[in-house]
Amino acid sequence: MTKHGFLLATLVLAGATLPIGPVTAATPEEEQAAFQAYFKQRFPNVPEDEFKNGTYAIDPVTRENWEAIEEFPPYENAISQGETLWNTPFADGQGYADCFPDGPAIMNHYPRWDRERGQVMTLPLALNACRTAHGETPLKYKKGPIADLLAYIAFESRGQITRVEIPQDDPRALAAYEQGKRFYFARRGQLNFACAHCHLATSGTKLRTETLSPAYGHTTHWPVYRSEWGEMGTLHRRFAGCNEQVRAKAFEPQGEEYRNLEYFLTYMNNGLELNGPGARK
């Protein structure tokens, strides 16, 4: 089996009916189509634009509770603090707006392939690159001010459509996508689980009292206020938590492993509307 066929073969094993060609000739575009088709088939009564709501798209009981929480969302303070941070000048008199001239509504520009650096550029990484370029200390990546900044940016970006690109003229971009894909399907930890075990093959089923959320929609609503955390947190904080739940060692937030994973997973979610920040259990 070729590396391009890995995702499609996994979807076949998970029970998907794939309206595309042989698994040995799959492109990222074909893999994306198969990924999205799998979830539409698995949850035929869920409108496509509802997948951005995660578990709440497939579980009416938890959705009712979530809608009640959204009446007075716990992330409102983070949005306000993030706006203040965005508008506060650095010591040199410059600010985030000087690095991001399009304004704060830039969530759908990331993650992206940075040809000059030869790596996946995420929004948190870009925010810290802006800070260090102006002599500021970089922010920590899991929570705190970075989550507040992201909450404000996400709020300003609501309604944008996920649109990650894999440049065809730079094989390094495809390699990063492939590495992210392999991370997603690799077993790890004492429990020997992969991301796909919970969020693809058994999505929608119960694990103890929790409904396992579908991977289609996983990247639309970050950062989130999780009741379990009692505060805002970033996507890479959640990646680390998932690794730890299967008793595997977590990787560094914004390290290559998680950035490539984000690149792959966000590409799989292309076409979905961004609706962050979010609230989760």
From Swiss-Prot:
Does the keyword field hold Signal? Answer: yes
- Kindly list the places in or outside the cell where this protein is found, as annotated in its UniProt entry: Periplasm
- S-S pairs: C99-C130
The entry's cellular-component GO terms read: cytochrome complex; periplasmic space
Q: What class of enzyme is it?
A: transferase
Q: Which residues bind heme?
A: C195, H199, C242
Modification after translation: Cysteine persulfide at Cys-242.
What Pfam families does this protein's entry cite? SoxA-TsdA_cyt-c (PF21342)
Q: Which residues form the active site?
A: C242
Signal peptide (residue range): 1-25
- List the effects observed when the gene is inactivated: No oxidation of thiosulfate with a simultaneous deletion of soxX alone or together with a deletion of soxB.
Q: Which cofactor does it need?
A: heme
Query: What are the UniProt keywords, alphabetically?
Result: Disulfide bond, Electron transport, Heme, Iron, Metal-binding, Periplasm, Signal, Transferase, Transport
Q: Which NCBIfam families match?
A: thiosulf_SoxA
Question: What is the name of the protein in this document?
Answer: L-cysteine S-thiosulfotransferase subunit SoxA
- What organism is listed for this UniProt entry? Allochromatium vinosum
